[in-house]
Every structure is written in C-alpha cells, then in structure tokens.
Amino acid sequence: MNNNIVNLVAAIVLSLGIIFGWQYFIVKPQQQKQQQQIALQKAKDLKKKESAQLEATPVIVQEASQAPRIKIDSNALSGSISLKGLRFDDLILKKYKQDLSENSPEVVLFSPSDTKDAYFAEIGWVSNLSSVKLPNNETIWNSDSEILTPEKPVNLFWVNEDGVKFLVAITVDENYLFTIEQTIVNNSNQELPVQSYGLINRKYTAVEKAVNILHQGPIGCIDENLKEYSYDDIKDKKSEKFSASKVDWIGITDKYWLTSLIPDKSSNYSSNFNYAVKQEVERYQVDFISPVQIVKPGENFSIKGRLFAGAKKVDLLDKYEKQYDIKLFDRAIDFGWFYIITKPVFYAMNFFYKYVGNFGISILIVTVIIKLLMFTLANKSYRSMKRMKNLQPEINRIKNLYGDDKARLNQEIMALYKKEKVNPVAGCLPILVQIPVFFSIYKVLYVTIEMRQAPFYGWIKDLSAPDPTSIFNLFGLLHFSLPSFLMIGAWPILMAITMFLQQRMSPEPADPVQAQVMKFMPLVFLVMFSSFPAGLLIYWSWNNILSIIQQYYINKLDK
C-alpha cells in the first residue's frame, strides 16, 4: 500500500474517527444542555428504608417534610436535618448557582422524600429481633441545639421504653463532610443484636438521563475496586449486592456533585445498589449494613461514619482521601481512560490558575508547556515529511518497475526508506501523541467543577460550554435563535483558520489524494468542533498558532 495512504489512515482517519465517536456520544443540542444542566445536577429520589432483617428489601416510605429540624449553616452549605427519622434531606450548595443569570438560585442537592426532586441520606440501626425497640423513620429525636455549624456540633438522643439510650453526634466541616458518631447505651437487662446501616435514596426520571461521555449514577469503592453502575444497569438488574466486603465508600454521583457514605473501617459490610418503582416513579438506592453486633446489658457500643454531600472539587476529594484513608475517592470524578494524563493536566491548569486567576489563561500556559515538550518530536516529524516528499519521484519509479509484484514493491520501498533513513510513520507521531492530551483537556473541561461557569474574556462566560455565538446571526447582531447545528461561533472559526494556516506552513503531502483530503480538514473540524466546550477550542486554536510559530522556526533552521 502507498505509504502516504498509510499516513492518511493513521493521521487523518484515526483522529477523525475518534472525533466522530466523541460527537456521537455527546449531546449535540448544547444550548439545551446548558439550560437543563441544573436538572441533571439536582438531586433525584429514591425511597427505601432498611427493614429488620439483613437480606430484606428496603421499603419505600412516606414522610412529610413538615418535621422538626436542625438548621445547617456553613460557608459551603445551608439546609436542615429532619429530626423525624434523622434524615439529611434538605441541602443547598451556597457557592454554586444553577446557571449564569444574575438572579440564579443556588444549587439544591437534597430534597425531602415527599417532594418532586426527592434525594436524601439516612443512617440508623436495625435488628433481626422484632422485640428490640430501635429508632425508625417515625422517631422524633431530641437535640441539644437548633443549629449545626462547623464551630458548633449537634448531639441528638432518644430513649426507648426499656431505657436503652441512642446517641448521635454530628459535626460538619467548612466544606461538605459530615461526621456522624452513633452510640448505643444498653441500660436494659437483655442483649441487643444490632446492625448499623446507611442509605442514599433518590428519585430518577427518564428526562434526566445522563450522557455517555461520563459516569452518572451509583458508584463506590468496594474491596479496593471502583464500582460504577449506570441507572440503566441497576434498572435491568434490579439489585447489585456485595456481601461481607470492605466498603470504603458508596454513593451516587452526578457530573459535578457527589453524595457518598463512608462507613466505619472497623468491619466489613454488605452493600446494595437497588432499583424500585413506586407510583410510576423510578427510585434508586445505595445502602450498606454492618454485621450483627451484640451489645450486652450495661455496655456501650459506638460506630463512626461520614457523609459527603457536595461539589466534586479535585483538591477536596484528594484531601479527604489522604486524611481519612478513603480509597479511590478522587475517582468519583470521571477522568476517563487517560486518568494518568488527565489528572496531571488538571493539576497543571489549577497551579497556574492560582497565579493568573483565569482558567482560560491557564489553558494557554499549559499548551505552551506541552508544545515545548513536544518540539523535538515535531521537528523530527517535519523533517521526515519533507524527506518523504523528496523521495516521491523515486517511489513512483519503483512503482512503475514493480507495480505487478506487490511483495517486491514493498521490499524495494522499505529498502529505500532504510537507505535514506526515513521513517514513513514519523509524520503521524505528533498527532498520535496529541490524541491523549486532547482527550485529557476535553475531560478536564467537561467533568471538573472548577471549570464549570469559569469565564475567559469577552463573550466566553463558561469554558465548559460551547461558544454561544454564531456566524449565521452575525454573532448576535441579528436577534433570532438558531438550531444547534448552526451554532458555529467565533472560536470554531478561529480554530479552522489557524488550522488552514498551519497546513500551508507544513510540507504538502506528496500523494494528491491525501493532499485533497487535508484541504478539507479545516472545514470538517469547523463543523465537528462547533459544539465542543469553548475551552477546548481555545486550546486547539492556540495550539495551531504555536504550531505555525514552531513551523516558521523550523523552516528558518533548514535554510
């Protein structure tokens, strides 16, 4: 096969095929996606309560939101805890708005079980003996305070008719982590076989289906392995059970938000990812339950767990993972296949952001660094392409001589490459190396909360969203809306122009078919990239500009 065609397949079809694959998995109407982003990030419901037996199916319960409550107030959170059933079902993320509008409300994470977007977490005790009287979802707890703050913990208690006292101490830090210590004081004259449990319950509707570019749904680290199940996975299976396992954490993840239970590390747990339908509403639940613990008369038993409910900030998850030895906690952020590249790329962007205060500028700086690291490879690629073009007359002569003998033809061409010290695939290497970098930058822009609503300059108010302008309405001068496929903004156009100029600076492929295909690539990329995040277009445009400068410098060296 003609080696220029091999280059074409490797350098063009491969990269274009990957981009088409991305486009297939990405929700194309990006404007609608921005408007619906809140719905995708708001809490969904699920309603199931653990019964007295270990293997029993959780029961959907009904609870009024008009219950006595403890107020939550911190720099990051507001809301309340229901004293009826001890349920975390009212939580607002104070640092995040639902959209970019001036009067946008804050993001709501938790909502009570009798609301449209119900989403809550719950901890408690169950027993395999019905005679053991435990607090349940109807229990009204007593509290020593009406407000929970980072400076002021809350202590709850409830005493059953046998004199057994149940204590719960709750603290919250300055971010999104609750620490919950439960204690049983057995003042009765009988042994108490008890199990601690925790659950996260969520309502889920079909209109809020997640896109396939990242994981949304049940997630956890069980036996030091990351477990991810889509809503459809759990719906099909009805339940996914893990018996007597080491549970570091389980929860439900959204694109930017995470709710996770982190049980005490003193024992293994049985955990479940469940699905049920109640009154035509799909409900999902993740839960865990401990082994049976016997609390003898006159003895106390305590167990401590944690609840994370908030934004998936990279530095914050890293901090908790290290501080509390929570395995793979950072994997709640879906960095994808290129995790080992994507996370360092984020760290680099975040590092420069601390100094320049703009993630767009940070992207430009990181691109320069990547370009410098790849300069030697790019130089070799350019020289190889130039040699390939110079060898084209000799290759054509060999084709004329051995056109009917493919084995001899390939042998002679490879001998020519060896003699002239030319690597026929060297021209593809820079593109192949850039593919994981491209994926990584795209992932950083798409999944990290730090990039959400992060502005650049001018009309780019959100680097994680597409360029909101379009050439078809003269970039907003004509006031009418356009379908998503016509939203071809200024940055996609700049990317295509710089790509065209870069091609003009590079050696033209010797093969005429390849040369013609290359001429159309800027137009193809213009259409393909128009719905991608603006931050990615800024990266690609700047990368093209740097490539033009680099090519000019290499050309000067060759003279």
From Swiss-Prot:
Q: Where in the cell is it found?
A: Cell inner membrane
* TM segment ranges: 5-25, 332-352, 355-375, 429-449, 474-494, 520-540
Q: Which InterPro entries match?
A: Membr_insert_YidC, Membr_insert_YidC_N, YidC/ALB3/OXA1/COX18, YidC/Oxa/ALB_C, YidC_ALB_C, YidC_periplasmic_sf
Molecular function in Gene Ontology: membrane insertase activity
The record's Gene Ontology biological-process terms are: protein insertion into membrane; protein transport
The protein's topology relative to the membrane is: Multi-pass membrane protein
User: Which keywords, in A-to-Z order, does the entry hold?
Assistant: Cell inner membrane, Cell membrane, Chaperone, Membrane, Protein transport, Transmembrane, Transmembrane helix, Transport
Protein name per Swiss-Prot or TrEMBL: Membrane protein insertase YidC
Q: Which organism is it from?
A: Rickettsia bellii (strain OSU 85-389)
